[in-house]
Amino acid sequence: MSYTFLQHYWWLLISLLGALLVFLLFVQGANTLIFELGKTPEERRLVINSTGRKWEFTFTTLVTFGGAFFAAFPLFYSTSFGGAYWLWMIILFSFVIQAVSYEFQNKLGNFLGARTFQVCLIINGIVGPLLLGGAVATFFDGSNFVVDKANVTALSQPVISHWANASCGLDALLDPWNVVLGVAVLFLARILGLLYMRNNIDEATLRERCCKKLLPNTVAFLVFFLAFFVRLLVKDGYAYDAGTGVVSMVSGKYLSNLLTLWPLAIVLLIGVAALLYGILRTWLKADYASGIWPAGIGTVLVVLVLFLIAGWNTTAYYPSNADLQSSLTIVNSSSSLFTLKTMFYVSLLIPFVLAYIAYCWHAMDHKKLTVEEVKDEESEAY
């Protein structure tokens, strides 16, 4: 196994984790709909317990996503998580209050009331997808950081990378295109949340409301996502010379990546078709409740392709707007050959982990959630 192969292999795995994370944001998307779908306390508890079965998957995937970056591309981890820490701290804090809200909203002695924690779930449902989408957009639009590896020998301050301003990552929200993708991810999460609850909840009224909410959320998602994607295809991209490592701007770089790596373009089209199929069939057929699966697979495929064209084909996946030559690539930010090779063998266990997750998912969802189950005091309902 060559060093180049392992660098591309680990970018593929991280891209897959990122794609799975976006799919699992259906938990956050559904939680933004607590009061839109739930008109009674029992209906709201149905929504919360539906997502409550899966919130750990989203949280652990987020942590694993960051951990994989730390192991495979540590310079990105130190630059982004260490420099843009306010952005990531807000994201992580919103996920922490999510966990607390699930556990304590209906506990005895909750003097804040269940509604307070339900509002916290909505906050996480909005902030999480919005900021994660904005963070991913910086892979294409750049961030303000400087990298100087020579500083590692400086005794007074051996800091390799630092943020170029005092915003500590919050400046990403000043770029309207980062916000556009963030809003697109938010509406996508709401769509997936609606499809998931329609499949997971055995309550006719709630399922009908989910269907009615699909169309406006889909239209909003398409407006924001297509605006970002079309602009992405025509904008200049960040490329590096494979021999020298010098980074330069290249016109239509991301479109070129899709054309050069043409199998990815096919995967992208399949993903879009699957996503729209899941949405439209659910909206058009009253008795169809499995739209989450084609839509979920489509989401994973589309996001996977976006990540891959951001890092493969001599593309700088984390561009620097402050210093172009500080931009990070899978070559200049990766771990050593020994580390990547060792982790390669460990990664062969991933299919077994996925099989266990699938088993747990099936065990939790083999029976659809009902109002009676939520009302049962002996159940473990939230």
Indicate where each model-derived feature is located.
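Membrane-interface capping segments at transmembrane-helix boundaries
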Residues: L280-D287, Y356-V371
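Long, contiguous internal "core" modules enriched in hydrophobic/ aromatic residues
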Residues: L108-A289, V305
